[in-house]
Amino acid sequence: MMLKEATGGKVTIITVGDAAVEPVMRKALAIGADAAVRINMNATDSFSTATEISNYLKENPADLIIAGKESLDYNGGAVPGMIAEMLDLPFVNACNGLEIVGNDAKVSREIDGGKENLSASLPLVIGGQKGLVEESDLRIPNMRGIMQARSKPLTIKEPSALSSETAAL
């Protein structure tokens, strides 16, 4: 949300899951996300999850796609890389620092023996790592945000035929 406040733009939360994930999505709306999209299927594997998110993003392009570390692939980080490949976008994984300057992103990540600083043009997919948001910057929704979140859109999309067939296998 700090990135949104610093550079403008819109934040949309996208997840693949059933109705049980909606309270977490509403919390993201309460702390400042503009919209949320839930793709209505149980995420059974990384490929079908990445396919669904990519299909949505093909119809609704984004300048910056930030994927969290916690995922159904036991934190393997496969989903953001697959999304980047499916959308033919650059990808940087394990990012713990991000700065947007114009149409470029400056990202940093810890590697064996030090820190790596990279630059990439937007649009871009990054996989987040601890440190991307400082603990002191974490937000707790206030009552006003919670009330506003009730009126913000939470769109429910049905999965594509391809992912439905893959999940059935």
Predicted features, each with a name:
Residues M1-L169:
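N-terminal glycine-rich FAD/FM-binding segment characteristic of electron-transfer flavoproteins
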